[in-house]
Swiss-Prot record:
The name this protein goes by in its record: Phosphoglycerate kinase
Residues engaged in binding ATP: A213, K218, G237, G311, E342, D373, T374
Reactions accelerated catalytically: (2R)-3-phosphoglycerate + ATP = (2R)-3-phospho-glyceroyl phosphate + ADP
Keywords, sorted A to Z: ATP-binding, Cytoplasm, Glycolysis, Kinase, Magnesium, Metal-binding, Mitochondrion, Nucleotide-binding, Transferase
Binding site for CDP: G212, D217, G236, G336, F341
Gene3D superfamilies the UniProt entry points to: Phosphoglycerate kinase, N-terminal domain
Gene designation per UniProt: PGK1
Length: 416
């Protein structure tokens, strides 16, 4: 799966056409009030670009929440239509469904670049292809899924996908359009450009920074990156499993991953074979409980962490070591914080790592932050705009870094 040769919205002739854009408007709601409109704002450049090129109609489609394949007013996209209208400075017509004769009629009778927002795609079981009933997964009928995809295709002449956050899902709106031209929107294209920079053609030295609780959750990630990078910083909870297995360090009540422990020797062996430097913490900030009010202490690899205490952050020497490792790199992919940054007392390791990453980017390095917790870090402590790229897709970026193909990306047309 090449990331760098996909058709972009800029390659399309949209004049007079029905342009279907799969966006990610999965915004947080409090009742019918949007509490954070960032995802809507992020889609504006693609929508505006298409509008500037005289389409017949722009049809926008998204999911919101997890309605489990049935209509649930709580997850309606209706509030998004009003917000989008005020951001675009243009009327947005909201339809009460995403497929069917009424929707087709509204789309086909639109003109002069009208903007239509469809109702939540996931109100139909055929979008995700299954639903949960009494703890069981029930698959959608194959013929019904094919029909749903045909109904979506009937609304469009060209297809644009700007929903990177859902690119790892083979959902109908991501892979179901029987159209010649299936292009990436600006958001999607930016994600692909940056991940291609790292995974297909990195400027070296290439560093991966990995955090998170369990080695077993990140095994595919570590294994894939060991074939690509020059060094890896292992931080967060999973560092304790590494140091206990490798050096028999006492880790007290810190996280230990039994299943992951069995995998550590193989990963270390592969790192040696590939000449990849593994950088582990050498000291820790400890706590007497997993709490923001915990009593804080310090421990080193030499002293070990006594029983009754747990490591919740990287200590001062580890911060220096991590900063020095970051300073040497020219390309960095960061997925997972080095400590429990949600608690102020245990956020210093994460803040110091972010500062080092920002400095690297300002000195010309490429610093890519995977979605999820690490994107939250960049937002919380300020710095998202100073890094090269903060991904909008937690699950999607993780699967890319694990070396998996993303259905929504594979499905995009190649550049001619």
């Amino acid at each position: 799966m090449s990331l760098s040769n996909k058709l972009s919205v800029k390659d399309l002739d949209v004049a007079g056409k029905r342009v279907f854009i799969r966006v990610d408007f999965n915004v947080p709601l409090d009742g019918d009030k949007i509490t954070n409109n960032q995802r809507i704002v992020a889609a504006l450049p693609t929508i505006q670009y298409v509008l500037d090129h005289k389409p017949k109609v722009v049809v926008l489609a998204s999911h919101l929440g997890r309605p489990n394949g049935e209509v649930n007013p709580k997850f309606s996209l209706k509030p998004v239509a009003a917000e989008l209208s005020s951001l675009l400075g243009k009327k947005v017509t909201f339809l009460n469904d995403s497929v069917g004769p009424e929707v087709e009629k509204a789309v086909n009778s639109a003109s002069n670049g009208e903007v239509i927002l469809l109702e939540n795609l996931r109100f139909h079981i055929e979008e995700e292809g299954s639903q949960k009933k009494d703890g069981q997964k029930i698959k959608a009928d194959k013929e019904a899924v094919a029909r749903f995809r045909k109904q979506l295709t009937a609304l469009a002449d060209v297809y644009v996908n700007d929903a990177f956050g859902t690119a790892h899902r083979a959902h109908s709106s991501m892979v179901g359009f029987e159209l010649e031209q299936r292009a990436a929107g600006f958001l999607m294209a930016k994600e692909l450009t940056y991940f291609a920079k790292a995974l297909e053609n990195p400027v070296r030295p290439f560093l991966a920074i990995l955090g998170g609780a369990k080695v077993s959750d990140k095994i595919q990630l570590i294994d894939n990156l060991l074939d690509k990078v020059d060094s890896i910083i292992i931080g967060g909870g999973m560092a304790f499993t590494f140091i206990k297995v490798l050096d028999n360090v006492a880790i007290g009540n810190s996280l230990f991953d039994e299943a992951g422990a069995k995998l550590v020797p193989g990963l270390v062996e592969k790192a040696k074979k590939n000449n990849v430097k593994l950088v582990l913490p050498v000291d820790f900030v400890t706590a007497d409980a997993f709490s923001k009010d915990a009593k804080v202490g310090e421990a080193t690899v030499e002293s070990g962490i006594p029983d009754g205490l747990q490591g919740l952050d990287a200590g001062p020497k580890s911060r220096e070591l991590f900063a020095a490792t970051i300073a040497e790199a020219k390309t960095i992919v960061w997925n997972g914080p080095p400590g429990v940054f949600e608690f102020d007392k245990f956020a210093e390791g994460t803040k110091s790592m972010l500062a080092a990453a920002i400095k690297n980017a300002q000195n010309g390095g490429t610093v890519i932050v995977g979605g999820g917790d690490t994107a939250t870090v960049a937002k919380k402590f300020g710095g998202a705009d100073k890094l090269s790229h903060v991904s909008t897709g937690g699950g999607a970026s993780l699967e890319l870094l694990e070396g998996k193909e993303l259905p929504g990306v594979v499905y995009l047309s190649k550049k001619a």
